[in-house]
Amino acid sequence: MNGNASKPKPPPSAKVQALIRNISRAERGPESRVDRPKSVVFSYWTKMLDLIGFALNSQGFQFQRIDGQSSMSQRKAALETFGGDPECNVMLASIGAAGEGIDLTSASIVHIVEPHWNPMAEAQAVDRVHRIGQQKDVYVISTYSGYKGTSND
């Protein structure tokens, strides 16, 4: 599923702002676009992926998305674009749809923005990035909401 959201944008939450800040820091990395790290953003809730997609669009990020509504051909196209396009550095993925059976080793940063009730599901999702064939160090960032507009990384 292409990550081009067209609905009106709600204001981003503190958690989404923290996520965008972290992705932006990674984007400002090496000069060569080829060397810039790719990020996978996992969420248990697809509505959260919608909100993150709005924020990424507003900041000009190119991204792909996989969730339970993605057909096999959409999943394949999203994975090929994410893995092969140096301009596409973010993959939004629901833990349920992308937690097993796919290879995301082109990424080196994993963001967990909505924890799954089963920690093993999160571990399997992280393993899509950190698996045999991975040539880079993998960083996992879990972002949890606090209160009064705060976020904890």
What are these regions, as identified by a protein language model?
Residues 74, 89-153:
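SF2 helicase/translocase ATPase core recognition
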Residues 1-90, 96-100:
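Conserved Helicase C-terminal RecA-like lobe
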